[in-house]
Amino acid sequence: AQTPLLHIADVSGSALFQGDCLDIMPLMPDKSVQLILADLPYGTTACKWDSILDLNLLWKQYKRIIKDNGAIVLTASQPFTTKLISSNYEMFRYEWIWEKTLFSNFALVKKQPAKLHENILVFYKKQPIYNPQMQEGKPYTDKPRKRTMGIIDDAIGIKKAIENKGERYPSSVQKYSNGNNGTKHPTQKPLELMKYLIKTYSNENDM
């Protein structure tokens, strides 16, 4: 096949390729990517660009280029969420919920609930990199106490005191503003949300 023409730019040490992902991914080596983070077309609007891609072709390339311990993280919204999970149910693991600050279905609020969330779906073959981005909470001290053998902990004796300075593991619901912060695309996702997901599922210098 003829190599497609690509516009390549270097930004902050990263190479940017402009083109159809189904043209670019075949040029990439097998098992070379640690994280695929994509905001695919949902097929939920009348916009010309909002057409669902061929998911069979997409998964063929995703499965080929992703590392065995890599993560595939895809934004979605119903009914596209169900379609996307069903297209690769064996690799689907769990979802995050992006809680918005502004609802998006303005024209339908008299007929259905105001929509304040989207889904973020996580797929992988084997346990990927997971760097939990700790959240702030109330500090506490877990006092020493006796413990007996149980289902989870077979140890017996005195459990040491645990001091927590307020860090909490992240919940599956993350709130980020979807207000217009100079965005140039009607469905553009918050930059901070994308940063959060990149930090969670990859390390510095990963591809």
Region annotations inferred by a language model:
Residues A1-M207:
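Core catalytic lobe of class I
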